[in-house]
């Protein structure tokens, strides 16, 4: 079978060959420097004892989980450190589809292709739900699309690719819709530091055992190659993610 190169690769090649500045909106690589404290800590880590280079607990290094829990104001037991936010999303999506509560995944359109791919990989059925013209959540469209076959609703805020920041009350309404059809809601907040208004509200502010929040440090700290992410899960779903 002959491999067909994706068309956007050609677009990237055109951009690289252009004789002017081209804004790369493909991979999400930050163009700023990692924090100086991080560089210093990495240099110091090289001299740590051998034991510090071995497997950590499957749910992540305890000190890191504790720091994440403090920042997100959640119980440490709910935090699972992952291989980037991608794995965090995968764990959350897998858990939602593993409950025998349907196989449909509602994705807001336009959607970052990752979520479509992972839905297919997990044998889920993707359904694209249109957003408002400005990229905001269309709660009524979500309500119309949701059914007893819906296992999961995926939200990404601040959003890739539109840049929309979803209103917390709209997210809360989606969580209520999910509860009515026994679905979970996964909210990917990896771009939370990109809300330059300084008023971003996390879905963790919603008191619900339906909400899974994922995030990471790739974007905010400019360390995409380190692959450090995490998920905050409702208590009933933590054990499955840790194993």
Predicted regions and their residues:
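N-terminal small-domain helix-loop-helix segment of the aminotransferase-like
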Residues: 2-89
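Aromatic/hydrophobic pocket-lining residues that form π-stacking "cages" and hydrophobic walls in ligand
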Residues: 11, 115, 174
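Helix C-cap/helix->beta junction micro-motif
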Residues: 18, 122, 177-181
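Short acidic capping loops at alpha-helix termini that bridge into adjacent secondary structure
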Residues: 75-80, 102-104, 149, 209-210
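Conserved PLP-anchoring active-site segment centered on the Schiff-base-forming lysine
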Residues: 77, 95-119
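Active-site phosphate-binding strand-loop segment of PLP-dependent enzymes
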Residues: 133-195
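Conserved core segment of the aminotransferase class I/II
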Residues: 212-243
């Amino acid at each position: 079978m002959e491999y067909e190169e994706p068309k956007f690769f050609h677009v990237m090649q055109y951009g690289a060959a252009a004789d002017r500045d081209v804004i790369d909106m493909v991979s999400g690589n930050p163009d700023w420097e990692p924090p100086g404290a991080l560089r210093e800590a990495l240099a110091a880590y090289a001299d740590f004892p051998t034991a510090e280079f071995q497997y950590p607990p499957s749910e992540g290094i305890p000190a890191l989980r504790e720091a994440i829990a403090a920042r997100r104001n959640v119980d440490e037991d709910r935090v699972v450190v992952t291989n980037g936010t991608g794995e965090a999303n995968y764990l959350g999506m897998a858990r939602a589809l593993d409950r025998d509560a349907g196989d449909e995944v509602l994705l807001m359109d336009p959607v970052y292709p990752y979520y479509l791919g992972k839905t297919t990989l997990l044998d889920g059925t993707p359904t694209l739900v249109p957003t408002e013209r400005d990229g905001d959540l269309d709660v009524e469209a979500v309500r119309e699309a949701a059914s007893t076959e819906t296992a999961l609703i995926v939200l990404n805020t601040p959003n890739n690719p539109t840049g929309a920041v979803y209103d917390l009350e709209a997210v809360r309404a989606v969580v209520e819709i999910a509860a009515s059809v026994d679905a979970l809601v996964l909210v990917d907040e990896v771009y939370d530091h990109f809300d330059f208004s300084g008023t971003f509200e996390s879905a963790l502010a919603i008191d619900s055992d339906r909400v899974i929040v994922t995030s990471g440090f790739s974007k905010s700290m400019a360390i995409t190659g380190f692959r450090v992410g995490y998920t905050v899960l409702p208590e009933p779903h933590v054990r499955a993610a840790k194993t």
